[in-house]
Amino acid sequence: MKDASATAIYGSKGANGVVLITTKRGKAGKINIDAKVETSYNTRTITPEFVDGLSYASLMNEALVTRNLGMAYQPEELELFRTQMDPDFYPNVDWMDLILKNGAWSYRANLNMNGGGNTARYFVSASYTEDQGMYNTDQTLRDDYDTNANYKKWNYRMNVDIDITKSTLLKLGIAGSLAKRNSPGLADNEMLWGMLFGYNPIATPVYYSNGYAPISHRDNVNKLNPWVASTQTGYNEDWQNNVQTNVTLEQNFDFITKGLKFVGRFGYDTDNSNWINRHRQPDLYKANGRSQETGEIIYEKMFSAYDMTQSSGSSGKRREFLDLLLSWERAFGNHHGGVTFRYTQDSEKRTVDIGTDIKNGVSKRNQGLAGRFTYNWNYRYFVDFNFGY
C-alpha cells in the first residue's frame, strides 16, 4: 500500500509504503499433506573466453614492438608456450576452466500439512534447500574439508488458529530458518573472481613440476595463484539462525455495538549468526631460474606453511513487538463511517558480542500512536482524517 490515507494508520514507519504479508492458515477438514521434491542443474553464467598462453605472449610482443620496445619473448620461448615442454617457466593455464565447473546441482524439498476442526485449525510447513557450489575442489582433501561455495537452508513454519468462543479467535505462529554457507578460506567470492579475471595464463603454473605451490613470479607483488587460494587455504563456515513467534488475539464486540473489534498482536523474534574460519597455507615458492651446472630449478621459499588455525565469532539480537488496534465500522443507510486507533511498540536489543560500550546493551525502542476517521455518503463523497505520533 502506498496511498497516504491507507498507510497513515501505520504511523511514521508507513511513510514509504506498507507491504502486508499474509501467511497460509489451516482450514477445517481432513488432514491434507502436500510434498514436493525438485532438482535442477544450474549452468554457470557465460564467462569470457581468454586467450591461451602462446597468444597472450605473442600479443605482448606485438604491443611492445609497436612502442619501439624490445620483445618480451623470443621465438624459442614462444615455442615453449606452444609445446609446454617447460611448464614451470612457460605455463599455459586457463584459470577460468580450472577453477569453475560447468554447472552445479540444486535441490528443493517441501512438505505442507493443514487440517483441523471447527474449533482449531493448523498449518505446518517445512522445507530444505541446497545449492552446490561451482568451484572445483581438491579431491585429495578429507571429506569434511570442503572448500566449495555451498549453501544449505532449512525453513519451518507452524500456524494454529483456535476459536476460544464464537467471538474470540486466538492465533499462534512460529517460523524460523537455519542456514549454512561455506566458502574457500582465503579467497572470498569477490577476491577469487578478481583473480580469475586478473591472472593471465602465463603468470604462474598451477603447481611446479616437483609439487611445490607457486607464488606469482611474473608480478612485482607476491600473490597466490587462484587454485592455491581456492583449494589449499582452508574454509569458512557461516551459520545463521532466526526464529519468529507471534500471538494474535481477535475479539469481536458486536454484542456491545455492531462493528466494534479489537486485535492485539505480540511478537518475539531472535536472530543469531555464528561463523568459524579455519585457515591454512602451504609452503609457497618462487622459481628463480635453473642451475647452470645441473639444470635443476632453483627454488626460493617465499612463505612458510602454517597448520590449520581457527577463529570464530558470533552476533545476535532479539526483537519484541506489540500492536494493539481498536476499530469500529458501521453503516446507517447511505452513511458509512469508521474509527480506528492503533498503538505500536517495538524494542530491539543486541544479545551477543555487545563489547564494552554500554550503548550496545541498551534496547532501541520505538512507540507510536495513530488514528483514523473515515466517512462517506453513498460511496460518492469521502472524508478521511488521520493522525500519527
Predicted regions and their residues:
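Membrane-proximal, glycine/serine-rich, low-complexity loop/turn segments characteristic
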Residues: 5-240, 248-251
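Outer-membrane beta-barrel transmembrane domain signature of Gram-negative proteins
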Residues: 93-114, 201-214, 280-389
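Short acidic/polar hinge/loop motifs at secondary-structure boundaries
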Residues: 1-3
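Short loop/turn motifs that connect adjacent beta-strands in outer-membrane beta-barrel proteins
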Residues: 26-31, 118-119, 134, 167, ...
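Gram-negative outer-membrane beta-barrel proteins
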Residues: 41-47, 130-136, 178-186, 255, ...
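Outer-membrane beta-barrel pore domains and translocons
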Residues: 36-40, 127-129, 175-177, 250, ...
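Hydrophobic core residues within well-ordered beta-strands of beta-rich domains
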Residues: 31, 107, 120, 154-156, ...
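Transmembrane beta-strands of outer-membrane beta-barrel proteins
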Residues: 33-35, 122-124, 170-172, 260-266, ...
